[in-house]
Amino acid sequence: MKVFTTIPQHDLRLVPKAASAIEAAGYDGLMTMENAHEPFLPLAVAATATERIELITGIAIAFARSPMVVANAGWDLQAAAPGRVVIGLGSQIKAHNERRFSVPWSAPAPRLREYVLALRAIWDCWQGRGPLDFRGEHYRFTLMTPNFVPEPLSGPPPAVTIAAVGPAMLRVAGEVCDGVRLHPFCTRAYLDQVVQPQLAEGWRRGGRAREQFEISGGGFIATGADDAAVAKMVEWVRYRVAFYASTPAYWPVLACHGLEDLGARLNRMTKDGHWHRIADEISDDVVALFAAVGRHDQLEQTIAARFAGVSDAVFASVATAVPADLPPDLVQDLRRIPAAFTGFAR
């Protein structure tokens, strides 16, 4: 099993030291997120300070960027870090697209499917596999003169993964992507009852092999060196569970456990401005559904029980502002947990 963590994004001057330390600690990859900061710039800095570790956008907001822009960014990163770049894309929700990024909204699953196909068409052109002639419902790319073709890569373009929660997006991930980035708002039951069957249908449609498809995430991790540290992280997870449970897009996960009323109640509370009270609605039993909880000395067994057999990689940090601090020997213990993924198809 791979173990990923995050790097500070608020100050690019901190990235080289942080990235080097993460690599030295034995992590498999470092991720950036698109919250308060841009996700590609820190990876460019990290590429110059590391030799082995994967560089992952987890995730970049797709529809706010043309596929051509992402194709260029991914290509240049892969040139600096050959074979180490994974472009993770996500649709975000309607409100953020329309009101935060000022981009039009449409059904996200078919649009993101087309987006990934457009990315691959651009990269195929740059690899000399024919002229650029992509014509879809949302994107058209038909112009590429030699002046705009970047220098060849020494290997394949980046792997492409997408964030997915619902069945339609999970099927898209399985059909056209190299992997899926599961939301931490996820339970083992949802992994078994929804994620695996929908991905399998996508693999069938796309003719893809499970062992060449990476499943990342699928739950929170609340850990620390002692019980007090674990308890502090549990409270952080409790609020995050409440936050996501208040959003209708995530209610299919609640439905797996008959918790639809909880989602509706939390949604009303947020609309009424009661953000400071939402965590009170999340019981310890509900936290346990969404998180692997345990001290460092318990974590290998806890993560194996929660994720093994489905997830190929786990996210050890909870946010870019809180990088993981797992002991290096624990990172290696987690990496020994068996996983189905053997490598991206190239």
Regions found by a protein language model. Name each.
Residues 1-346:
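Active-site-adjacent structural elements that line small-molecule/cofactor binding pockets in enzymes
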